[in-house]
Amino acid sequence: MATIGSGSARVSDTTSTSSAYLMTTNPTATEGNRLLRGASANDASKVPVYHYPPEQDERSKKAPFIEDRLNEELTNPEYVNRLYERWYSEGLSSNEVALGLDQIDNQEVQETYQNLGLGYREYIDWRNSM
């Protein structure tokens, strides 16, 4: 991983899967733009404290932000393959999928959705060449 101010940047190989149609992931910043707001238990003035990564609820081990969940799920090759197969079996074209994924206003998942649409286009090409 790249270190700020180190002068040299190393990037780990994130494309370890052999399938060409899977979505490739690029290393990005580890922190999102969103923070959770909470109150410090030790502070009498109850000044809000912002923290990231957010503390996970004991009942749920999932990340609280949908963007984090989506990025985690959409980098799982098994999940992505099932998603592509479902779209393919429903007869959706890559343009229909791209238009559907393009309707999101959330900037944090927009790049993930664009990569997903490109991966589906490559999946269709791979399936049609079989």
Swiss-Prot record:
Localisation per UniProt entry: Secreted; Host cytoplasm; Host nucleus
Family per record: Belongs to the RxLR effector family.
Region (Disordered): 1-61
InterPro entries associated with the record: RXLR
Function: Secreted effector that suppresses pattern-triggered immunity (PTI) in plant host.
Induction: Expression is up-regulated in spores.
Residue numbers covered by motif RxLR-dEER: 34-59
Name of protein: Secreted RxLR effector protein RXLR-C16
Biased composition (Polar residues): 1-31
Record remark on domains: The RxLR-dEER motif acts to carry the protein into the host cell cytoplasm through binding to cell surface phosphatidylinositol-3-phosphate.
UniProt KW keywords: Host cytoplasm, Host nucleus, Secreted, Virulence
Main location, first listed in the record: secreted
UniProt keyword annotation of Protein biosynthesis present: no
Cellular component annotations (GO), alphabetically ordered: extracellular region; host cell cytoplasm; host cell nucleus
Superkingdom in the source lineage: Eukaryota
